[in-house]
């Protein structure tokens, strides 16, 4: 049985500000099932941003598990991610899940892989999903060559990825944790 999949999730960090966004397309094989899915969530008292790529049902299971870890560890992102990864490696059900998470708080950006690995990406850019490499390339160029804020970099990079990747679209949801306490969300 085919799974729902295909997406672009991107997180960009500059200074004390981080933006995490994703497109809204869900595909089943080569058919677009939904174009306005929300793959980005705020967790733990709105202090943690999380986005998923991969099987939709699998990703929601991981969201629930990750949120439980955040609650258990008082919102400590690194510890919660490592504890989820430990569970992922030892729990038979979790090992079969086909999804990845990109998560961020005001201090760290992480990728939690389908193998149960926790990676802190270089340059403050985390990208997952079928359009992730396209978005990451665009974000890196913009981060290194402009003074754009993370929100603008994520917007432009997701647009570029959506133009290239057939499993991504131009319906974006972007959440921001800001250094001035201006946390916000954007839906385009």
Swiss-Prot record:
Q: What class of enzyme is it?
A: hydrolase
Q: Which CDD domains match?
A: protease_HslV (cd01913)
- Catalytic function, reaction form: ATP-dependent cleavage of peptide bonds with broad specificity
Its predominant location is cytoplasm
Which residues are listed for Na(+) binding in this entry? 162, 165, 168
Active-site residues, record numbering mapped to chain: 7
Molecular function (GO) terms for this protein are: metal ion binding; threonine-type endopeptidase activity
InterPro entries on file: ATP-dep_Prtase_HsIV_su, Ntn_hydrolases_N, Proteasome_sua/b, Proteasome_suB-type
Q: Which residues form the signal peptide?
A: none
Q: What does this protein do?
A: Protease subunit of a proteasome-like degradation complex believed to be a general protein degrading machinery.
Family matches, as PANTHER family: ATP-DEPENDENT PROTEASE SUBUNIT HSLV, METALLOPROTEASE TLDD
Q: How does it assemble?
A: A double ring-shaped homohexamer of HslV is capped on each side by a ring-shaped HslU homohexamer. The assembly of the HslU/HslV complex is dependent on binding of ATP.
What family does the database annotate? Belongs to the peptidase T1B family. HslV subfamily.
Q: Which NCBIfam families match?
A: ATP_dep_HslV, PRK05456.1
By what name is this protein known? Answer: ATP-dependent protease subunit HslV
Tell me which species this is from: Thiobacillus denitrificans (strain ATCC 25259 / T1)
Q: Which gene encodes it?
A: hslV
